[in-house]
Regions:
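AAA+ P-loop NTPase catalytic core and its hallmark functional loops
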Residues: 2-147
Length: 147
């Protein structure tokens, strides 16, 4: 489902001395259900301008089904920068980390015991799809190929 932006956020809110406006949402507009959360803005976070331009390009791309793959050394700020970008455009995020034992059910959901029977329990990808949250997957390359 395509996103419909409702406001524009100044690039100055991202620490840039630019007059560029970045589409986003009003803070009070989006609600989120667990495990999604709107990350608080860290006013001390400094964006790499080139990285931020790539995020904005992805964010404003017309086809919302296109995933964004970010690579870089451990600790260089990939996850933090994405979370801080989403905080500033007021979008809930569901974050998870893959491992070699990660299975498709960990992502999509599974049937589980519930009140004497069975019920479908949504996984993070399903919750993100239903709620409009961004799904942030760390260490995706560690997941088995079938995931």
């Amino acid at each position: 489902m395509p996103m419909t932006f409702t406001t524009c956020i100044s690039a100055q809110d991202f620490g840039l001395a630019s007059e560029t406006m970045i589409p986003g949402f009003q803070a009070s507009q989006l609600s989120c259900a667990a495990p999604a959360q709107v990350v608080p803005v860290d006013p001390c976070h400094v964006f790499d301008e080139s990285f931020l331009q790539d995020l904005v390009l992805w964010w404003t791309w017309p086809d919302t089904r296109i995933p964004l793959y970010i690579a870089g050394p451990t600790g260089c700020g990939k996850t933090t920068s994405v979370l801080q970008f989403l905080a500033r455009v007021h979008v809930p995020v569901i974050s998870l980390t893959c491992s070699r034992r990660f299975v498709k059910d960990d992502l999509v959901g599974r049937w589980g015991a519930h009140e004497g029977g069975f019920a479908w329990i949504d996984g993070p990808a399903t919750i993100a799809w239903k709620t409009g949250a961004v799904l942030l997957i760390n260490e995706f390359s560690l997941a088995p190929p079938e995931v």
